[in-house]
Amino acid sequence: EPLAGFRHAKALEHRTKIDWAKQMKWLADEVYPNAEKIIMVCDNLNTHDKSSFYETFPPAEALRLAKRFEFHYTPKHGSWLDIAEIELSALSKQCLGKRRIDNLEDLNSELEKWHTDRNAMQKGVDWQFTTDDARIKLKHLYPIVTF
């Protein structure tokens, strides 16, 4: 959550639709239990889709989760990717360094410490890129419409 300075990192053995759906359920039920709508910005990985809920949970639970989330997908080049890359860089420098972590349990312990400390500092990202900025900087992507 860039503006609030919240992040959560967890390493899993695999990156399947089921793994992702369970993480989204945790986010909905544990982190944002009172939110009517959770807006997620995701990359275009094939697991990041509402269909993952239906492959993981019974239909009623899948529908409940699908209604709670609104997904927006990042373009291949864009400032949302920059935000993710900033966080990954901070994670790499502040938590992982150049050492090798031998197992998932130790890695998750290190990740927990890192994101707890970083969340306590409320290190957020104030994203300032507006539609007007986009029309100037990315004018080649905006068609010129004449009437």
Question: What is the predicted function of each stretch?
Answer:
Residues E1-F147:
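Short functional hotspots at interaction and active-site rims
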